[in-house]
Amino acid sequence: FFARVAPTLAEFQDAIASARDSSAAPGGVLRVTTGAAFGRHYVVPLIPAFQRQYPGVRLEISMNDNMVDLIRDGFDVAIRGGTIADSSLITRRVCTLAMVYVASPAYLKKFGTPKTPEDLVNHQIIALRFLSGAISQWDFRVRGKAVAFEATQPTLTLSDTGMVGDAAVAGMGVTRMALHFAWPHLQAGRLKLVLMPYNDPGAREMVIHYPHREHVAPRVKAFVDFMLASLEDEPSLHATLKDAAPYAA
């Protein structure tokens, strides 16, 4: 019973708070969920500035790659990657999540540069395992058709999206990762792009979403607006494949 009435009660409480505090600074507890790697790299570094601007807001941030139900799990805001099609949520786009294939210059010097997806069978592969247990599929476009590569025997398998890039920088093999995570490594020369003519970047997006309510709590609006403005100014989140082309091996 409580699970059914909790969202309605929360909406009622937020409406009262919004009406009462419309002229006051945002305050109260704000519960946020985000992916582990994205949270470490992009969300947490922005928190000091947010709290200086909104000292009355107390943040609780959960960083993991679990599947999250915003309402059921009691979160106010989610910052997540994927395709969001829930009409009960307000969705605000942060950036496109283009995927790329990378390896370190040292690895490529030792093992050579893969020229086609078929070459990957002769390379060390750094794979990502989802919480479901499945290994992330690598997608390519070959002669206009979608082709999937599945690493049956990866050299290294990790469950953290940020760590696959660190492993690639360490020269442990070829991996697939989001361009925004690869961007600083590409600029610094720690990674090179491979298989660019065949790369399928995907169609996923990083979004901020929160419950669709008539009265959005001031603390929610303040946090969402602050994050959108701050992340808009982060170059790595808006780098394109065209921008990345000079970093190809």
Predicted segments with their positions:
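Short helix-loop hinge/linker segments at domain boundaries
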Residues: 10-33
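Central regulatory/effector-binding core of bacterial HTH transcription factors
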Residues: 27-90, 239-249
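C-terminal effector-binding regulatory domain of bacterial HTH transcription factors
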Residues: 56, 183-184, 188, 198-249
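Short beta-strand-to-loop elements that line the ligand-binding cleft
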Residues: 59-63, 149-160
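Flexible hinge/capping segments at coil-to-helix
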Residues: 88-128
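Secondary-structure junction motif
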Residues: 126-144
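A ligand-binding cleft/hinge motif common to bilobed small-molecule-binding domains
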Residues: 167-190
